[in-house]
Amino acid sequence: MKTLLLTLVMVTIMCLDLGYTLTCYKGYHDTVVCKPHETICYEYFIPATHGNVITTRGCSTSCPGGIRPVCCSTDLCNN
């Protein structure tokens, strides 16, 4: 009985994701799971032609530069 219990505990530990990974938006609807060292979600705007802007989103290790950067550190916060 102890062997069965120990086996179940070991299988459970191996199946669990013991590390936390951040999830950020990459596009308007697409999401990406960040690498373990990337702890920031960002969103910033790049000027384009005719007064339009290009929105860039993703994961980073620090808040990037850009026009009006928005940086945060919780899941899907860069929307």
Swiss-Prot record:
Annotated Pfam families: Toxin_cobra-type
Gene Ontology CC terms: extracellular region
Keyword Secreted: yes
Signal sequence, renumbered to the chain: 1-21
A molecular function (GO) term: acetylcholine receptor inhibitor activity
InterPro entries given in the database record: Snake_3FTx, Snake_toxin-like_sf, Toxin_cobra-type
Cystine bridges: 24-41, 34-59, 63-71, 72-77
Tissue expression pattern: Expressed by the venom gland.
Keyword Secreted: yes
Location of this chain's protein in the cell: Secreted
Keywords: Acetylcholine receptor inhibiting toxin, Disulfide bond, Ion channel impairing toxin, Neurotoxin, Postsynaptic neurotoxin, Secreted, Signal, Toxin
Family: Belongs to the three-finger toxin family. Short-chain subfamily. Type III alpha-neurotoxin sub-subfamily.
Role according to the record: Binds with high affinity to muscle nicotinic acetylcholine receptor (nAChR) and hinders acetylcholine binding to the receptor, thereby impairing neuromuscular transmission. Causes muscle paralysis, spasms and increased respiration.
Protein name: Short neurotoxin 8
Organism: Pseudonaja textilis
